[in-house]
Amino acid sequence: MAVMNHLRVILQVSSSTLPWRRCWVPRLVPRRSCSLYTCTYRTRNRALPPLWENLDLVPAGDRQSPINIRWRDSVYDPGLKPLTISYDPATCLHIWNNGYSFLVEFEDSTDKSVVEGGPLEHNYRLKQFHFHWGAIDAWGSEHTVDSKCYPAELHLVHWNAVKFESFEDAALEENGLAVIGVFLKLGKHHKELQKLVDTLPSIKHKDTLVEFGSFDPSCLMPTCPDYWTYSGSLTTPPLSESVTWIIKKQPVEVDRDQLEQFRTLLFTSEGEKEKRMVDNFRPLQPLMNRTVRSSFRHDYVLNIQVKPKPTASEVTP
């Protein structure tokens, strides 16, 4: 999950103030199955941006993100109710390239754009949303499901304004943030997403920003209410373990041309040697002792239907 400039990308917190340690990191990330071609940990991480060049620099935490979600191991929780999302399109402010992703930011001084319900005890205000994507369609999402990756992932970032005075404070504390993750898959053209895509040429370079008014990001949500949830962290430094993750089960469809426009953005500022903005995701992290809960029963998700046994009269001799 990319952190916006309000945190100055790393919340202006130096590594000396965080519990960092250097240690050997085993290759815990499973092989990612893709329909196009084999998508392995090594292949996927070969071209990661400079943020993740030193993969042995990890925080001394036990609830890091992203993770691989295993359907079989997730636990159905009947107490998880549907999310209630209420976004005011008028709170949309601007879109900008922060050098790691492109973000759409919202006015968050009041509860005009909020999410509640599900695993959340309070209303959380929408601060921004952004995407992660790959250099090719075989990967790009930060989270995976049964080791399957998607070409991109949307993150809608919210903060707990009941317990905290500011987004910056909330981002560093437990239960401070709630992030909704939505997978993107190749399919039909996404009409609402096109408004974002049409703006991307104007923010091609790092630190470019343009106004982007009246947009309701709920149009980017899948219709299915089902989701997984777990306790995790930011996926960019300082990697604070402050996030309640809510990962939607159903992906949304976008067409290949729309995704290709994401890849025209640059990590670099104007005048610098161009470096395409691709593979802007963090490597998978071990689950440790956490439980991933689901709002749905597994047999429903897998569309398993138990057919009744035929009666004697229905059996063909």
Swiss-Prot record:
Keyword Lyase: yes
Chain's role: Mitochondrial carbonic anhydrase that catalyzes the reversible conversion of carbon dioxide to bicarbonate/HCO3.
One CC-aspect GO term: mitochondrion
Domain of life: Eukaryota
Family membership: Belongs to the alpha-carbonic anhydrase family.
UniProt: Zn(2+) binding residues: 130, 132, 155
Family annotation (Pfam families): Carb_anhydrase
Keyword presence, Metal-binding: yes
Binding annotation for substrate: 235-236
Single GO biological process annotation from the record: response to bacterium
Annotated transit peptide: 1-33
Gene: Ca5b
Enzyme superclass (EC): lyase
Transmembrane feature ranges: none
GO MF assignments: carbonate dehydratase activity; zinc ion binding
Needed co-factor(s): Zn(2+)
Domain Alpha-carbonic anhydrase: 37-296
Species per Swiss-Prot/TrEMBL record: Mus musculus
Record field: catalytic activity: hydrogencarbonate + H(+) = CO2 + H2O
SUPFAM superfamilies in the record: Carbonic anhydrase (SSF51069)
EC number(s) on file: 4.2.1.1
Major localization listed first in the record, in broad terms: mitochondrion
Protein name: Carbonic anhydrase 5B, mitochondrial
